[in-house]
Every structure is written in C-alpha cells, then in structure tokens.
Amino acid sequence: MSIMKTAAKLAVALLVAVPVNSAFAGGHLKGWEATGSQMPVSSETIAGKTGSITHIKSKDMWDYSKAPEGMPRVVGATCHNSVVTDPDGVLLGGVGVCESVDPNGDVSLYSATFGKDGVYNATLTHGTGVYADYAGIKFTGSFIGQLPEGGGIYHLTPK
C-alpha cells in the first residue's frame, strides 16, 4: 500500500471522527453514529532513517443525519493529519486535527489519534454555538472503503 494511500486512509479515519457528536438524554450526553468522507488535497512526506512522517491535508464532509435537532445535516471540515510509517511503508499510527465552521456559523475543533490497526479515537475538544456543550465527547471509528488515490468513507460510533 502506498504511503499516500495509507496516510490518507488513517488521516481520514482520524478526523472523520470529528462528525460524531452527542445529544442530551436524561441529563447525560449521548452520542450517535456518523459517516464521513475524506478527499486529500495535499500531502508531504518527510523520510528518516527508520521511518517516515506524512502530513496530509484533506477536505471532509460529515453526515450528521442522526444528530440532535438544531444541528445541520451536512458539515464540511478541513483536516490535518500526520501519519508515521516504518521503512516498508507499514502504518504505525498518527494524529490529526479537524476544524469546521458549519452552515449555521458554529465552530468545532476535533483531535484524534490512531494506531497501526487504523482504528482511531477522537474528541471534540472545543466548539461554539450548538457544539459548545459537547466539548469532551469521545468516539471511535475506521474506514469502510477507500479509493486508490486515498479518498475514502469512514464510520464513527460514540464511546
């Protein structure tokens, strides 16, 4: 698997986690499933002696169809991921950040990590408007399909 494809796959999975939010239910935050798509727009690889780091920037779209009332159905985001691979291009893990200004003007910021299995763990770290009360919400996810050039679809579930 190419470094770009591996990096894109994990990077997308990473910040795809961004779309998973939560709703209040019985006084507690409750999460829901979400789906996202990632299309890489740029990448840069820095090679070391024992591995490489690939930085990937992508434009993502999140399906919030299961989100609480008042949240938009579709949200666009810009994601930045750093993926570490060994000398053979095998994924070791990475980190990512996604930022979004939704159609209503509300802002959300997500951070995530992922391991060599491609499973990512993400957190909504900060938000305004409808996202403000959801800061700290956690979710997990992975890719469900990917194109040869690195774009893909991922699925998220609340933790």
Language-model region placement:
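Beta-strand-enriched cores of mature, soluble protein domains
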Residues: 24-159
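Cleavable N-terminal signal peptides
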Residues: 11-13, 20-23
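Bacterial N-terminal signal peptides that target proteins for export
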Residues: 1-10
